[in-house]
């Protein structure tokens, strides 16, 4: 039996410039054609995904249509709603591609709650970007209409709303995910970072936050005993001195070296930094490898090991 692998999809795997349902379903069909490479390779696949654009758009719709009789849903419920919609699109796309390939596998979405601490400092310091990019004028108008919202500039690409992003400390449905994997089913889990909940006695109480999907994927990978965590993004490798004349591609890199690069502020917060931090956390917790690469490099990774591979120590080159 192949390796158990958690693959975390980036937003570009779901959403193009067209935010319609049809366009997102088509994007996921293209994504599924790449992901099936793992199954063809004999790997046990667990899929996770982000929801930043989708949950932000949903909140805008909720806010615009909110009335006393039909109030807007809170953020934790909006996360659950996007888990359902994206999971529906993803499992249909995967099941179609699996049938076309003659592979006897099926895919199922797990509505997943992720436990966080009620005392997490993130609740008083919102940093997680969600929703569409806006111009400064658009962000100022949205702030005027929604005084409780916070907007910041995101990696030089425009302004976005930011919300609390607490760190995951547990995944409630871990056993359900493992049961599906053991039954030969491909689970989709911790969508959008999971629904943030805090434990209160026998209750799990939702919180208005969005957990970073890379940290949630790392926690899931750790808890299910994954052999590898693969974080997909828009570029095939992690780079230092990114977009500078002395840009350097990282292929095999140690945790210690990555931590040095973090101290040098090589990675943009809210962009590459959480992916690197999640990869480090997984390698430290398990001793197994983490990989950061692009969706369209999956075949290259499966066949040749290309991408950025993070291990405790740098491998000796042959």
Swiss-Prot record:
Recorded metabolic or biological pathway in which this protein acts: Metabolic intermediate metabolism; carbamoyl phosphate degradation; CO(2) and NH(3) from carbamoyl phosphate: step 1/1
EC number: 2.7.2.2
InterPro entries the UniProt entry points to: AceGlu_kinase-like_sf, Asp/Glu/Uridylate_kinase, Carb_kinase
MF (Gene Ontology): ATP binding; carbamate kinase activity
Entries under Gene3D superfamilies matching the protein: Acetylglutamate kinase-like (3.40.1160.10)
Superkingdom of source: Bacteria
Keywords: Arginine metabolism, ATP-binding, Cytoplasm, Kinase, Nucleotide-binding, Transferase
Pfam families hit by this protein: AA_kinase (PF00696)
Main location per the UniProt record: cytoplasm
Single GO BP term: arginine deiminase pathway
Subcellular location: Cytoplasm
Catalytic activity line of the entry: hydrogencarbonate + NH4(+) + ATP = carbamoyl phosphate + ADP + H2O + H(+)
GO CC, alphabetical: cytosol
Similarity section: Belongs to the carbamate kinase family.
NCBIfam families cross-referenced by the UniProt entry: arcC, PRK12352.1
Descriptive protein name: Carbamate kinase
Organism field: Lentilactobacillus hilgardii (Lactobacillus hilgardii)
């Amino acid at each position: 039996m192949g390796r158990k692998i958690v693959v975390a999809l980036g937003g570009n795997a779901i959403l193009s410039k067209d935010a319609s349902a049809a366009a997102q379903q088509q994007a996921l069909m293209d994504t599924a054609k790449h992901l099936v490479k793992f199954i063809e390779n004999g790997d046990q696949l667990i899929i996770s995904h982000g929801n930043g654009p989708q949950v932000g758009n949903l909140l805008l719709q909720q806010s615009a249509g909110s009335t006393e009789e039909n109030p807007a849903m809170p953020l934790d419920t909006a996360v659950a709603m996007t888990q359902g919609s994206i999971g529906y699109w993803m499992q249909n796309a995967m099941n179609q591609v699996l049938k076309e390939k003659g592979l006897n596998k099926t895919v199922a979405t797990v509505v997943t709650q992720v436990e966080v601490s009620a005392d997490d400092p993130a609740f008083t310091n919102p940093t997680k970007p969600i929703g569409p990019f806006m111009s400064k004028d658009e962000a100022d108008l949205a702030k005027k209409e929604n005084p409780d919202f916070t907007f910041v500039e995101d990696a030089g690409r425009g302004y976005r709303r930011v919300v609390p992003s607490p760190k995951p400390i547990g995944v409630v449905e871990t056993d359900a995910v493992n049961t599906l994997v053991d039954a030969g089913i491909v689970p989709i889990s911790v969508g959008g970072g999971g629904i943030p909940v805090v434990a209160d006695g026998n209750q799990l109480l939702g919180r208005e936050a969005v957990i970073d999907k890379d940290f949630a994927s790392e926690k899931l990978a750790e808890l299910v005993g994954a052999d590898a965590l693969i974080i997909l993004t828009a570029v095939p490798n992690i780079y230092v001195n990114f977009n500078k004349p002395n840009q350097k591609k990282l292929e095999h890199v140690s945790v210690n070296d990555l931590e040095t690069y973090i101290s040098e502020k090589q990675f943009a917060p809210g962009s590459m930094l959480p992916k690197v931090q999640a990869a480090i956390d997984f390698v430290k917790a398990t001793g197994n490898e983490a990989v950061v690469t692009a969706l369209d490099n999956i075949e290259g990774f499966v066949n040749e090991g290309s991408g950025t591979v993070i291990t405790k120590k740098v491998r000796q080159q042959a």
